[in-house]
């Protein structure tokens, strides 16, 4: 399997490193406008190949991405401290207006995995600019937010996060929605697992999830390790046809009467991309929050200067 990463910044290289050490691809092409830095990153990465299962890695131009089973987009303007993901929109739209058509000239049938922020908007932009079927354009969405949510809850409950079912849906950003009504371990709802939990404490967990990126950016400038692992999980689900349920961002198809946007819902991910969406039953409050999240994204989409 061949994959390409567009953008060799901290996120792009974290994705590359994670995929290499997990033997995800046979061939990996990396592309960046800063050729000198790109070549240095590739040199550093290939020198570790003797320690893992081999992957063919090289720096390349967009033409070298031809034949990629998946192309991962991490390129774009960097989120500044205090800047929301949505503030990034127009700067990254301008970058993608040149990038996506050029990429499609070489990879007309690829799976496109968008990681650049604001990811839901950039997934929508990539879909419209690429002309690919909706299921083949996927955003990393709230995969990372869901992981953060599960980690914090599992720490409190003293279980492995992989044994806890919990989801963050909607925008990957300030309007994201915690689906508290579906949090469970082995089918047991959270209220039965820990009935003495203070609602304020639960609210604090969600605030930690929602503000995590801002806190990390304030301290170290960017998030990288966790999203690299999350992207690897998505790529493995795609290329290994795992039919794995992940909260990726994709075009809405009438679920919950939402407007046409890209946002995250639990979706079955396999070799064809997003294969179907699992429409969970939500409480009235969760539905309202999800609609609010979708409306915020729709307003941003409507403001884009194409």
From Swiss-Prot:
The keyword Glycosyltransferase does not apply. The keyword Protein biosynthesis does not apply. One of its GO terms (molecular function) is L-lactate dehydrogenase activity. Allosterically activated by fructose 1,6-bisphosphate (FBP). It is an enzyme of class 1 (oxidoreductase). GO terms for biological process: glycolytic process; lactate metabolic process. Keywords: Allosteric enzyme, Cytoplasm, NAD, Oxidoreductase, Phosphoprotein. InterPro entries: L-lactate/malate_DH, L-lactate_DH, L-lactate_DH_AS, Lactate/malate_DH_C, Lactate/malate_DH_N, Lactate_DH/Glyco_Ohase_4_C, NAD(P)-bd_dom_sf. Belongs to the LDH/MDH superfamily. LDH family. This is L-lactate dehydrogenase. The gene is ldh.
